[in-house]
């Protein structure tokens, strides 16, 4: 764990994501693996100065990342998930977006949706759904992607209400 000393949220997430992928593969308990892993990640993060906020991760996203990581421990889905849960700006953006999507007349159940932040350098194509103070939400074939407000000016509108952003 010395490698985690003074780690950035992204460095922490990359290492913790690989460990979590391997724990998922081993599946050490008949019951309670998810709760045990959540407690382990929270404590590991705390020990190295990171707040791991898994409340911003939907069940669908966790299941998807877990399946990908079980099939390939080096798959980046779990690291991306943990980056969203650990990097403060990403976690705040997801929390605000989830509150927005989960309230009002157009509210939808969120736990069955994959909701994530856009990765730096990623191209996002989707239908614009919502804007909060921190991000804009685009519905893509793979789920809902939160894009930082500063990057929304790069959106190029296309036919059918689609927008394409190069971040």
What are the residue ranges of the model-derived segments?
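Structural detector for short beta-strands of small beta-barrel domains
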Residues: 112-134, 162-167
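SH3/SH3-like beta-barrel fold
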Residues: 136-141
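Short, conserved phosphate-binding/catalytic loop or strand-edge motifs used
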Residues: 17, 57-65
């Amino acid at each position: 764990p010395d490698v985690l000393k003074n780690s950035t949220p992204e460095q922490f997430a990359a290492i913790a994501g690989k460990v979590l992928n391997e724990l998922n593969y081993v599946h050490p308990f008949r019951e309670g693996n998810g709760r045990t892993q959540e407690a382990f990640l929270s404590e590991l993060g705390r020990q190295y100065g990171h707040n791991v906020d898994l409340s911003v991760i939907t069940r669908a996203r966790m299941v998807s990342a877990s399946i990908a990581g079980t099939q390939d421990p080096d798959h980046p889905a779990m690291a991306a998930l943990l980056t969203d849960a650990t990097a403060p700006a990403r976690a705040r953006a997801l929390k605000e977006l989830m509150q927005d999507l989960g309230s009002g007349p157009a509210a939808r159940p969120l736990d069955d949706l994959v909701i994530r932040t856009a990765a730096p350098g990623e191209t996002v194509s989707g239908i614009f759904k919502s804007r909060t103070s921190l991000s804009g939400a685009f519905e893509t074939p793979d789920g809902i992607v939160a894009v930082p407000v500063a990057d929304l000016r790069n959106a190029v509108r296309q036919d059918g209400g689609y927008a394409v952003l190069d971040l």
